[in-house]
Amino acid sequence: MHPSLHFSTRHLLLSLGSVGALIVIASSPQLLGDRVGAALGGVLAVSPVWLWAAALAFVTSLAASGCAWRSALARCGGDLSRTDAAARYGVGSLLNAVAPAKLGSAVRFALFSRTLDADGRLWTTGGVAASVGAARSIWLALLLVFAAASGVLPLWPLAVLAGVLALTVAVALVARDTSPNARAAHALDAFRALRRSPRAAAELVGWVGLAAAARVGAATAIAAAFGVDQPLLAALLVGPALDLAGLLQLTPGNIGVASAAIAFALHAHGVGSGTALSAGIAFSAVETATSLAFGTGSALFLFAGARTAPRWSLAAAGATACVGLAAAFGATVVLPLV
């Protein structure tokens, strides 16, 4: 069940152009003004230990998100392990890091759909995506309550989420006692399965909650790296700001938009504009680097698991990844201490 995915020339050119523009900006930050250049300088001055802690939290979030998909897919007849699910999710994150317009999300959808053999698998996968989104809305609503109470965000996103959750509950109640008579009806497969098994629903919500908590942990580490007071409280404000900024991804990895959202949330927490901007840039940089590394490893894992791949390829890929991580950690953390 390892799909062959094809990309049009337009998609490839769009991705290469976006990445090229980001490289130009990264190599010449003065193009964006003195404030951005100073913010990039602030990123280079922080302790790499906190950045590695944030990277580990991002990896946890990616893996947990893949497991959330697997928990819903398994109830719909999907045949995949948690490791396989995390790898498929990671490939989508890899593409999202280098391509705009959430191209990676479409690829992720295709990869997960290949784990189903029944008719209407695309509809079923769509329902799984909707169920994962509904579970994510629960945790996002909790963060939005905190952000709204702090005066960082308005109340209308919370009202929208309440409507989404109410609609989800209604769909689950309707889907419980219905059976699919057409392909489109398979969109309710996930809701039907989760409604009949509260344990499965709790497992899905738990995995999504772990992913959300890991992202909050990453934001906490970044805030601590820049000396932000009460970094956990600051991170709780960053979470909903990032989710709202991610609704429309115009750049690879949502770089720029995400950094601005983080800077806005931290500034509302009382952080100076320069430090807030540096923290936003650091968050986006670490998240993008983690997505690239985790996604590349995921792609190698899926390739090594294919029937046509040589048996030694998985071991070679794992060994190369371990050596690369050890070298990077030694160069950024251990060597400066010597």
Enumerate the predicted regions with their spans.
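Hydrophobic alpha-helical transmembrane segments of ABC transporter permease domains
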Residues: 128-150
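Extended non-transmembrane interhelical loops and adjacent amphipathic helices
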Residues: 71, 86-119
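Transmembrane helix boundary and interhelical junction motifs in multipass membrane proteins
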Residues: 63-67, 99-109, 136, 245-263, ...
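Predominantly cytoplasmic-facing regulatory/coupling regions of multi-pass membrane proteins
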Residues: 1-90, 146-247, 278-279, 286-338
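Transmembrane helix-loop junction
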Residues: 74-75, 97, 114, 224-225, ...
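Membrane-interface alpha-helices at helix entry/exit sites of multi-pass transporters
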Residues: 82-87, 104-106, 116-133, 270-283
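Interfacial segments of multi-pass membrane proteins
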Residues: 112-120, 238, 242, 259-279
